[in-house]
Amino acid sequence: MTIKVAIAGASGYAGGEILRLLLGHPAYASGELEIGALTAASTAGSTLGELMPHIPQLADRVIQDTTAETLAGHDVVFLGLPHGFSAEIALQLGPDVTVIDCAADFRLQNAADWEKFYGSEHQGTWPYGIPEMPGHREALRGAKRVAVPGCFPTGATLALLPAVQAGLIEPDVSVVSITGVSGAGKKASVALLGSETMGSLKAYNTSGKHRHTPEIAQNLGEVSDKPVKVSFTPVLAPLPRGILTTATAPLKEGVTAEQARAVYEEFYAQETFVHVLPEGAQPQTQAVLGSNMCHVQVEIDEEAGKVLVTSAIDNLTKGTAGAAVQCMNLSVGFDEAAGLPQVGVAP
């Protein structure tokens, strides 16, 4: 049986990264996976070669308009559309189609959170695509609807999940994530011009205003016996891609560095895509570039009485497209790690 895959939003950064990963997937090489319709809005009518010269294998493919009719007839549909647009398309696709949504439309469980941060009517919740979270891998196996997590919540959740579940910390965390400009997408913006970003760092959507704040709190709350307060600050850096997250929280009394390290090493011992670094080593965005890996370091600041956890991911791979392909693998029955690089690109 051949699985036919469509990508809506194929000309965006996430869509292009999904294509890159699918072309390296063993199922594509064997003929078990076929790349079907590639759609977008503003770039419809262009060839992929004009838009993505790094994908010469599909250079002659023409980008089509994004409609339910174009996407019908595929076994798997990846949605790389702006927030708020996915629901309209997804609701027109049949229940037998596996729909993997890279936008935020179906991530949040709390309707009030969605309406506060996104300003539209909540459309529901789908199985959430961080397989490393307790119970989520099982929910994703065979799932016909999947919500791919946000890039910031991925880095923050994987950094803090073991500490929260083990009760090492108080449920009050501070997260600072430094991100590359590709996280904002391809849309032209003065704030993202090279002359505005090069040689400069800038915090944005501070003081709890960023849309990923409730998603981080939701994820950590799943493994906590009480709600987790999250202070989240994103920082824009002059990098094409990558997220470096530093997360801190007050330690429970008596928790030692040895205990914290043991908790993290045990929690991630069987996880292919999370690597707890040796003591003293620090996560680097370059080390995970182009890979589906998350590198994590956990330390104790004894003077401050806090845990410090640092994580690094590629926002376009583990933070979006890699997670989407990982979820597809679980949904259709491929090996979970198929087609997903575990080695970064350096220098």
UniProtKB/Swiss-Prot annotation:
SUPFAM superfamilies: Glyceraldehyde-3-phosphate dehydrogenase-like, C-terminal domain (SSF55347), NAD(P)-binding Rossmann-fold domains (SSF51735)
GO BP annotation list: L-arginine biosynthetic process
Cited function: Catalyzes the NADPH-dependent reduction of N-acetyl-5-glutamyl phosphate to yield N-acetyl-L-glutamate 5-semialdehyde.
Keywords: Amino-acid biosynthesis, Arginine biosynthesis, Cytoplasm, NADP, Oxidoreductase
Pathways involved: Amino-acid biosynthesis; L-arginine biosynthesis; N(2)-acetyl-L-ornithine from L-glutamate: step 3/4
EC number: 1.2.1.38
GO cellular component, one term: cytoplasm
Keyword Amino-acid biosynthesis (UniProt): yes
InterPro entries hit by this protein: AGPR_AS, AGPR_type-1, NAD(P)-bd_dom_sf, NAGSA_dehydrogenase, Semialdehyde_DH_NAD-bd
Protein name, as recorded: N-acetyl-gamma-glutamyl-phosphate reductase
Reaction catalysis annotation: N-acetyl-L-glutamate 5-semialdehyde + phosphate + NADP(+) = N-acetyl-L-glutamyl 5-phosphate + NADPH + H(+)
Molecular function as annotated in GO: N-acetyl-gamma-glutamyl-phosphate reductase activity; NAD binding; NADP+ binding
Pfam family, one: Semialdhyde_dhC_1
Keyword Cytoplasm assigned: yes
Subcellular location: Cytoplasm
Protein family: Belongs to the NAGSA dehydrogenase family. Type 1 subfamily.
Annotated organism of origin: Corynebacterium glutamicum (strain ATCC 13032 / DSM 20300 / JCM 1318 / BCRC 11384 / CCUG 27702 / LMG 3730 / NBRC 12168 / NCIMB 10025 / NRRL B-2784 / 534)
PROSITE patterns linked to this entry: ARGC
Catalytic machinery residues: C151
